[in-house]
Amino acid sequence: MPYWRLSSFYFSYFALLGAIIPFWTLYLSDLGFDPLEIGALAAIMMGTKIVSPYLLGWLADKSRRPMRVIRWSAFLSFIFFLGIFLSSGFYYVAVIIASFTFFWNAIIGQFESVTLTQLGKHYSQYGKVRAWGSIGFIVAVLILGWLFNTIAIR
């Protein structure tokens, strides 16, 4: 994979995180969730980081097709994320968030492996490739922060 394909993945992945993470609790509060429920939903998001990278990493190793696992994880996380707009009940949102983040949190570890494999002996370029993720996060937070300050979140 060329430098820009790897870099664009990191930019996009972390831009999406920048669109979700800083504003997620505000969105949940706007939906009427109380602080305990918001904390529980945030814990679910973080809890899937403990399990999903290992399970889907195992699957990628067994299949020897890590990009297929990454693509399917991205697709399924997108489908589950769309479910957040269908209902606002706590248990429904908890299941949707658990499903979304199960697949989403598994992507980055697999892509790190793909990146290092693709860079091969040029592994010293990793920092430059990965920096695009930080740029994507910052750009998303700044643009959406301004946008949400101008218009309503919902």
Regions found by a protein language model. Give the residues of each.
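Structural signature of the two symmetry-related core transmembrane helices
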Residues: 68-82
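Residue-level signature of mid-helix packing/kink "hotspots" within the transmembrane helices
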Residues: 46-54, 137-138, 142
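Hydrophobic core of transmembrane alpha-helices in multi-pass small-molecule transporters
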Residues: 11, 80-109, 114
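Helix-to-loop junctions at the C-terminal end of transmembrane segments
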Residues: 51-65, 148-149
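Transmembrane alpha-helix termini and helix-breaking/packing motifs in multi-pass membrane transporters
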Residues: 137-154
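Interfacial helix-cap and linker-helix signal at transmembrane-aqueous boundaries
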Residues: 28-29, 59-60, 131, 147-151
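Helix-loop boundary and gating motifs at the non-cytosolic
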Residues: 1-49
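Paired intracellular helix-loop junctions of major facilitator superfamily
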Residues: 115-126
